Structures are given as structure tokens and as C-alpha cells.
């Protein structure tokens, strides 16, 4: 399954480049719930000190390689903690799957 390969490569690339600077990587949305379709994108929240431009380049590379769209959100740990009680963040934490 290309989606699983893309997710694994995405997480491994981030862990390799930003070792010690990533606090969480969470898969959320339809792939986390298991109700995805072939039209679904892969939603991932990255918490930590990560360069958003690098993430966009990585998403583009994986789109070209696997034909899979990864929709990544990057937040600092401080911002994530400020928003932790917002409904979006509660949903991500409740239904999401922690990848790292």
C-alpha cells in the first residue's frame, strides 16, 4: 500500500533530520479512523521545531514518488500546548494515532 510507505518514509525523514526537535507526529483524520477512501489525503500534525518549507518539499517528493497527498500541519510545542483544549486539537488527540 503506497499510503503506508509514504507515511513511513515521511516519519523517518523527519526523525532523521530533526532528531531531538520533534515532540509528536500524529496521524489524524480518515486514515487514523480507518474510514478513508481513495480520494482521501493523509493528515499529519507535527509538533516541534521543524522547518515548514522542508515539510512542504518532503510532501511534494512523496506525492511524486507514491501519488499520495500528505496534508501536514506544523506547530511549535508552545503553540500546540496553548491550543490543546481547542476542539481541533482535542479531536486529533482523541482519534489520532501517534506515529512518534
Swiss-Prot record:
| Top-level division of the source organism's lineage | Archaea
Which residues are listed for Mg(2+) 2 binding in this entry? 41, 43
- Which top class of enzyme applies to this chain? transferase
For this protein, the record's InterPro entries field holds: NT_sf, Polymerase_NTP_transf_dom, Type_VII_TA_antitoxin
> Which reactions fall under this protein's catalytic activity?
L-tyrosyl-[protein] + ATP = O-(5'-adenylyl)-L-tyrosyl-[protein] + diphosphate; O-(5'-adenylyl)-L-tyrosyl-[protein] + ATP = O-[5'-(adenylyl-(5'->3')-adenylyl)]-L-tyrosyl-[protein] + diphosphate
- Where is Mg(2+) 1 bound in this sequence? 41, 43
Question: What's a Gene Ontology MF term here?
Answer: ATP binding
Describe how the cofactor binds: Binds 2 Mg(2+) ions.
Instruction: List the EC numbers from the record.
Output: 2.7.7.108
Needs which cofactor? Mg(2+)
Protein's UniProt keywords contain Transferase: yes
UniProt keyword annotation of Nucleotidyltransferase present: yes
The sequence motif named GSX(10)DXD motif is recorded at 29-43
Family of this protein: Belongs to the MntA antitoxin family.
Explain the purpose of this protein. Answer: Putative antitoxin component of a putative type VII toxin-antitoxin (TA) system. Its cognate toxin might be MJ0605, which it might AMPylate.
Write the protein's name.
Putative protein adenylyltransferase MJ0604
Amino acid at each position: 500500500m503506497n499510503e503506508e510507505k509514504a507515511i513511513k518514509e515521511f516519519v523517518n525523514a523527519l526523525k532523521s533530520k530533526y532528531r531531538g526537535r520533534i515532540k509528536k507526529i500524529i496521524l489524524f483524520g480518515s486514515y487514523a479512523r480507518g474510514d478513508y477512501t481513495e480520494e482521501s489525503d493523509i493528515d499529519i500534525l507535527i509538533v516541534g521545531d521543524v522547518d515548514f518549507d522542508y515539510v512542504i518539499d518532503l510532501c511534494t517528493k512523496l506525492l511524486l514518488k507514491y501519488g499520495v497527498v500528505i496534508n501536514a500541519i506544523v506547530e511549535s510545542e508552545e503553540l500546540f500546548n496553548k491550543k490543546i483544549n481547542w476542539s481541533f486539537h482535542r479531536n486529533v488527540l482523541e482519534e489520532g494515532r501517534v506515529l512518534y
